Amino acid sequence: MVKSEMEFKSNFSIDAILAKKPINTATQPIKTEPVHHHHQYVHPYSNSDGELSASEDFDSPSRTSTPMSSAAESLSSQNNDKLDVEFDDELEDQLDEDQESEDGNPSKKQKMTAGSDTKKPPYSYNALIMMAIQDSPEQRLTLNGIYQYLINRFPYFKANKRGWQNSIRHNLSLNKCFTKIPRSYDDPGKGNYWILDPSAEEVFIGETTGKLRRKNPGASRTRLAAYRQAIFSPMMAASPYGAPAPSYGYPAVPFAAAAAAALYQRMNPAAYQAAYQQMQYQQAPQAHHHQAPHPAQMQGYPPQLNAELFQRMQFFGKFPSS
C-alpha cells in the first residue's frame, strides 16, 4: 500500500509536469497566431532586419526633422527672408521712382488735377483766413464773410460744407494774427469783424508750404526790447542815481517804476493804488514838494508820451484797441 501510494504520488507529479508541457506547447501556437496576424506592425521591432529598416526609415528625410535638417531648414528660411526683404526694398525704390516720374511729367499731373476740381487747396486755414481778409475791400470780414469767400473761390469748400467751418473758427480765436473788433451801432448786420493784427505785417503765406511764415523773426524781439526800454528808461531816470528825468508836466514821483509795470501788465489799477499809498507815506514829511496827483489822474499819461505808448501797446497786443 505504501509503495503504491508513493508510486501514485510520483506518477502524479511526473504526469502533472508532463501534462503541463504538452498543454503549453499546444497552446503556444494559438497565442502566437494573433501576434502573427499583426506581424506587419510589430515586425520592425521583432528582428534585426526590421530594426535596420526602421533606423533607415527614421534617418530618411520623409520622417520627422533631425537637428541637422532643422538647421538646414532654418538657414534656407533665413535666406528666403533676406530675399523677400531685398525684393521689398527694390519694389519700394521702384515705386518711388515711378512716383517721381509721374510728378515730373506735367501731362499726367495736369490730367490728375484737372479731373478733380474739388481737391483741397494747398493752404493752411490760417493762410486762407489771411487771404480772405486781405482780399476784402475794407480789410475786414465777418465769420460768414470768410465762409462765403472760401466757398466762392475754392470749389472744395462748396462741395464739403462740414468740418472746415469749425477749423476756421478755432484758428480765428487761437491765432494772434487775427483780432476781433466790435461792429458799430450804425452798421447793420450781425457778427463782429475780424481784422489782421498790426503784428501780422511781417507775416506772409509760404509759396511751397502754404502756411504762414514770418519775414524776420528777430525783428519782433528787437522791437519788443526797444519798446520796453522806451517805457522804463524815462521813468527810471527819476532815480537819485540816474540822470535827471525830462519834464512832462508831472512831478518825478517814486512810483514811476510801479506805474510802468502796471502799464505793461494791461493797465492794472491796483498797482497805482499801492504806489500812491507808498508815495503818500514817503512824501508826508516833505511839505515843500508838489502834491502828487490822484491815481485816477495817473491813468492818463502825459500828452507827449501817451499816443506813442498806446500805439506800441496796441502793436504788441497787450490790451485791446477798443
Curated annotation (Swiss-Prot):
State the species of origin. Answer: Drosophila melanogaster
Protein's recorded name: Fork head domain transcription factor slp1
Q: Where in the cell is it found?
A: Nucleus
Q: Where is this region: Disordered?
A: 31-81, 94-120
Instruction: Report the InterPro entries cross-referenced here.
Output: Fork_head_dom, FOXG1, TF_fork_head_CS_1, TF_fork_head_CS_2, WH-like_DNA-bd_sf, WH_DNA-bd_sf
Q: What does this protein do?
A: Transcription factor involved in segmentation. Required for the formation of the mandibular lobe. Different levels of slp activity seem to be required in different segments.
Q: Which UniProt keywords apply?
A: Developmental protein, DNA-binding, Nucleus, Pair-rule protein, Transcription, Transcription regulation
Q: What is its main location?
A: nucleus
Hey, what tissues is this thing expressed in?
Expressed in the posterior half of each parasegment just anterior to the parasegmental boundary.
Which spans does this entry mark as compositional bias, Polar residues? 61-80
Q: Which GO terms describe its biological process?
A: anatomical structure morphogenesis; anterior/posterior axis specification, embryo; blastoderm segmentation; cell differentiation; heart development; heart formation; mesoderm formation; negative regulation of transcription by RNA polymerase II
Q: Which residues form a coiled coil?
A: none
The ranges the UniProt entry gives for DNA binding are: 119-210
Protein origin, superkingdom: Eukaryota
Question: Under the cellular component aspect of Gene Ontology, which terms does the record hold?
Answer: nucleus
One molecular function GO term is: RNA polymerase II cis-regulatory region sequence-specific DNA binding
Q: What Gene3D superfamilies would the database entry show?
A: Winged helix-like DNA-binding domain superfamily/Winged helix DNA-binding domain (1.10.10.10)
Q: Where is the composition biased (Acidic residues)?
A: 94-103
What is the gene name? slp1
Pfam families in alphabetical order = Forkhead (PF00250)
